[in-house]
């Protein structure tokens, strides 16, 4: 039987729509607070009185990193967007194909490398270090990093790469700064991050306290017949109402509780089932 392009496209649309309905039918509309169970609706924020990490503490972290760099003979470290960049600067930036980087030299303030069309946004976010070197679409960001190394007298020194630096960035820098000895920055970054300050511990404790309260509220919503998405959404809604950010939850019922990271199979809670709930949140990034 012959079929036209229009008929073929319509058939594909129908299949996709059926798949979407099957998947979405298992999801609970947690975004609508009117549908949240009473134990979740009763929750209120528990983030009052928290003290965010100050710029002074971040500068102290940079100073400590520079001390570790001196001890290890490292002339600079290069950091891409991620938790380490946030740790030293509070800058959150989505990593993309356009290189955005923080360079911490052995002495002095950090220097930044940024796509030219993102400069205005970068200046809104960057509070530590005002030297931002931009690159146009027809220019190399790695040449900008190499220029920073040259200005810092580190063109032929050990240059540490933070563990989240991607291969194409490392490879581009290797070509732009062939005399640099590219090494791991982990002795520096882990040397700072693995020892938590009192302020960090307080934020981690608050995130833990919020998570425990959310567990109690979410478990109070368990009922026979609910699916894993409904329970997971109750948990993330509880974390959000308590003031947690970046909430997440992995859920498994019955035999699927043996899957440490959950299963995509539809699940309905039955009396006597084991319930797996792996969940958490952050407070001020911790």
Residue ranges and their predicted role:
Residues 74, 150, 178, 206-216, ...:
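Generic secondary-structure signature for well-ordered alpha-helical cores
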Residues 80, 184-186, 215-219, 247-252:
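Short beta-strands and strand-loop turn motifs
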Residues 85-96, 186-191, 195-198, 226-286:
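Short catalytic-site patches enriched in acidic/histidine residues
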Residues 128-141, 168-170, 212-218, 235-246, ...:
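A short, terminal or domain-edge coil/loop segment
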């Amino acid at each position: 039987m012959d079929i036209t392009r229009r008929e073929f496209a319509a058939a594909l649309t129908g299949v996709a729509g059926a798949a979407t309905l099957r998947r979405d039918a298992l999801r609970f509309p947690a975004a609508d607070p009117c549908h949240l169970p009473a134990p979740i609706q009763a929750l209120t924020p528990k983030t009052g009185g928290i003290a965010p990490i100050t710029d002074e503490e971040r500068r102290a972290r940079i100073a400590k990193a520079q001390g570790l760099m001196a001890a290890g003979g490292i002339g600079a470290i290069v950091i891409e967007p991620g938790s380490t960049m946030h740790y030293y600067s509070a800058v959150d930036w989505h990593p993309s194909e356009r290189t955005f980087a923080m360079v911490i030299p052995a002495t002095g303030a950090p220097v930044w490398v940024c796509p030219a069309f993102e400069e205005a946004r970068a200046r809104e976010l960057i509070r530590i270090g005002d030297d931002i070197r931009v690159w146009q679409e027809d220019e190399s960001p790695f040449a900008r990093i190499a220029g920073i190394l040259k200005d810092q007298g580190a063109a032929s020194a050990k240059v540490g790469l933070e563990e989240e630096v991607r291969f194409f960035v490392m490879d581009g820098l290797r070509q732009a700064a062939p005399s640099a000895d590219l090494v791991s920055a982990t002795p520096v970054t882990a040397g700072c991050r693995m020892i938590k300050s009192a302020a960090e511990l307080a934020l981690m404790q608050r995130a833990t306290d919020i998570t425990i309260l959310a567990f109690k509220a979410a478990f109070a919503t368990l009922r026979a017949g609910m699916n894993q998405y409904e329970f997971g959404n109750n948990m993330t809604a509880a974390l959000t109402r308590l003031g947690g950010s970046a909430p997440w939850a992995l859920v498994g019922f019955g035999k699927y509780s043996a899957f440490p990271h959950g299963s995509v199979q539809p699940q309905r809670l039955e009396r006597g089932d084991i319930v797996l709930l792996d969940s958490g949140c952050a407070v001020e990034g911790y």
